[in-house]
Amino acid sequence: MRADERDQPARVTVVGIGADGWDGLSPTARRAIEGADVLRGSARQLGLVPGEVAAQRLPWPSPMGPELVELPGAHPGARVVVLASGDPMLSGVGTSLVRLHGPGAVDVIPHPSSVTLACARLGWAVEETTVVSVVGRSLDLVTPHVTPG
């Protein structure tokens, strides 16, 4: 590591990946993954990356919260790429990392979210669609949106 790199805060790149895996990634997302020294993600996400990618693959433990706190400094000098489902900034790991470490420590390369994909399939305008996330929240939040009146 160069001396000027030691003075910079460690950065993490978060890459959104869809169910279509490697084939659905943009060239920018592929380059980020191919250039990684360390890949973090779920076992399923890591399995979507071709074996030719030489990065060390580390699946998230459960719970993954303590590991997120340690990123990005857990792998000094390494290019760390975190794989995320769809859009990492829609109730995803990208949001968590930015909250923990600030936007200056995280680069995000998004993929279409499940919301965007569902709206496209149904022909609905995303901006006219109510989205209720129950990720880490009570299912009671859904009730007002699915009951009459």
Regions picked out by a protein language model, each given a short descriptive name:
Residues 117-123:
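Structured adenosyl-cofactor binding patch, chiefly the S-adenosyl-L-methionine
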Residues 1-117, 135-141, 146:
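Class I S-adenosyl-L-methionine
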